[in-house]
Amino acid sequence: MIVAEFFENGGEIKGFKINGHAGYDDYGKDIACASVSSAVQMTVNAITDVFGFEADVSAQNNTVFFKTASGDIVLQKLYKAFIMQLELLSQEFNETIKIKFT
């Protein structure tokens, strides 16, 4: 299962950690994992490269960690769009993606 953990502080999303494997299909054929990976890459690139927000980012051993300091409204909307995409993927690929907030 892929676990998407979003970090909240004062009602704002400050980052996320994504880890695990969907187990929807064999490694290299898992479209659920590929879909989540694509959504993560697009979100990270939009936040850092397109909108220019600074972030702490690391990716290793099936885990992506991403954290920002800004509470900018644009950043919050980008996080919300990412959460919405993960929710849609969770509905499409039942029992493969869990979303939680801490």
Predicted regions and their residues:
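Short, conserved glycine- and acidic-residue-centered signature motifs
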Residues: 32-36
